[in-house]
Amino acid sequence: ENKIKSYDEKTGKGLIRHALIRYGFKTKEIMVCLVVNGKKLPKAERLIEKLIQIEGMTSITISPNTRRDNVIMGDSYEILWGQGYITDYIGNVKYQISPLSFYQVNPVQTEKLYGLALEYADLKGDETVWDLYCGIGTISLFLAQKAKQVYGVEIVPQAIDDAKENAKINAIDNAEFFVGKAEEVLPEYYAEYEREH
């Protein structure tokens, strides 16, 4: 209808690389993020008009990605409409999920898996837990309900922003999050811990 071409990885031409659709299984919120080979989406208003007719539509964004590789998402995103994120729950923990952050594709099964992990971890309330590659803090915040302290490490800054916001949303104050490579952050904080004890 708008004659917008899809991206061709071989030639590097075309605009629409991917369409990421996220759905909050418990909240019924929907996010659409179009990954584009450029900076803008022509005739975006027409697309927005159509998408907001869908029940539950909460966020419409674009993520520019002009790299000549097969990495899906760009390094940033622009909000075209809505709040720029959706929310969902795993158990009784609420999560804010932005376009660039990893979120489990099947939160219904994830809730069961995390419940088992929490049961098997048999946390008594005096443990310190490190969640390496923590994403938006799904496991971290789930375990923080039973642990004394939880630390999450993730290389994606937007995911850590979401993790910190998720801790705030849930009034969880025994979780801290760090941006960086796990293999660098963990030894640094372990050395600091050793000096203090």
Where are the regions that the model predicts?
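Extended interfacial segments that mediate partner engagement and assembly in macromolecular machines
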Residues: E1-D8, I21, K26, L41
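Glycine/charge-rich, flexible interdomain linkers and switch-proximal surface loops
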Residues: K10-L20, R68
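Short, aliphatic-rich beta-strand segments
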Residues: I21, K28-N37, K94-S98
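Short helix/loop segment immediately N-terminal to the Walker
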Residues: K5-K13, V129
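Rossmann-like S-adenosyl-L-methionine
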Residues: E49-I54, T58-H197
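Short, non-transmembrane amphipathic alpha-helical segments
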Residues: E1, G38-T58
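Short flexible coil/turn linkers enriched for glycine and charged/polar residues
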Residues: F25-K28, G82
